[in-house]
Amino acid sequence: MECKEDLTIVIDNGSGMCKAGFAGYDAPHAVFPSIVGRPRHTGVMVGMGQKDSYIGDEAQSKRDILNLKFPVERGIITNWNDMEEIWHHTFYNELRVAPEEHPVLLTEPPLNSKANREKMPQIMFETFNTPAMYVAIQAVLSLYASGRATGVILDSGDGVSYTVPVYEGNTFPLSITRLHLAGGDLTDYMSRLLYTDCGYYFSTKAEKEIVKDIKEKLAYVALDFEAEMQTAASSPSLEKSYKLPDGRMITIGNERFRCPEALFQPSLLAMDYDGIHETTYNSIMKCDVDFHKDLYGNVLLSGGSTMFPGIADRMNKELTALAPSTMKIKIIAPPERKYSAWIGGSILASLSSFQPRWISKEEYDESGPSIVHRKCW
């Protein structure tokens, strides 16, 4: 079916943030926390225009009187009723559109279950009455955003990290690796480091947001972890100050690079996983040997937890040590990679060649939810 590109809605549902906007734009219009909050005690907020539920930033700001739910856990939608609320909020409050008037492109994690894949078109067509929809894998969209059809994507967000080899637009499920280590774990680790090393105690949800901000503003990846530890021990040159909301200043030293080091050494979090350099290498090694050269030459970083300064140089160093000496390693770290899955969706939905790939309402009514397996791959 033919769809007006400029009115197509693109929604990237992450564990931490929901990114939403219109195809053809180079950035999402709305980015808000993937949170649904409900009053702990009905009646507490009567007279304050109490609502049954609060979404995103509003839920975050009222967190002291709400029970917060996170419908996307480790990248996977686990609570469909709450997810429906987030989508409703996205359409009517954030984008201010009627979903029955716009095609919708949704993102999904690699290796998404059959049942989860079918639930998305079911809700879009039966609840929101959209005229057309499509489901695309986040990592593949990130690759499209970089103008490539071949590469291995290291996608690390708030809840989960994946390494996904793609060749000429095709994924290889057996070579995809999934790592239950991402931004949320790093924020928790930074909390622990600040407490054990510096005596700063951040316990409430509001204080967790402060730790997240410290991580995002001050953390970086060391090229050589042991050497950086020695530098930090012998001089204050790596220390940075951070101003807390109450005006107090705190000083942060080696925690700045010890926190994201866990991506390369999950054992720091007592996790028995390979680091992101090893999962990337392992994913490539599981692919046909003829693809290796193109994959090593196109290692793409995507997602908010790849935004640490120094991560690309460190990945290059670690992969060079693992790969055959004849292989040329190239790490691609686009500046807008925090939103690259959304940007890829925006590009894909705008292509005239993509238009026949939409699942139309008529096709859904005829075939049911299983049509998603036939049309979205």
Swiss-Prot record:
InterPro entries: Actin, Actin/actin-like_CS, Actin_CS, ATPase_NBD. It is an enzyme of class 3 (hydrolase). Pfam families: Actin. Its EC number is 3.6.4.-. GO terms for cellular component: actin cytoskeleton; cytoplasm. GO terms for molecular function: ATP binding; hydrolase activity; myosin binding; structural constituent of cytoskeleton. Keywords: ATP-binding, Cytoplasm, Cytoskeleton, Hydrolase, Nucleotide-binding. It is found in: Cytoplasm, Cytoskeleton. It catalyses: ATP + H2O = ADP + phosphate + H(+). Its main location: cytoplasm. One of its GO terms (biological process) is phagocytosis. Belongs to the actin family. Actins are highly conserved proteins that are involved in various types of cell motility and are ubiquitously expressed in all eukaryotic cells. Multiple isoforms are involved in various cellular functions such as cytoskeleton structure, cell mobility, chromosome movement and muscle contraction. This is Putative actin-24. It comes from Dictyostelium discoideum. The lineage of its organism: Eukaryota, Amoebozoa, Evosea, Eumycetozoa, Dictyostelia.
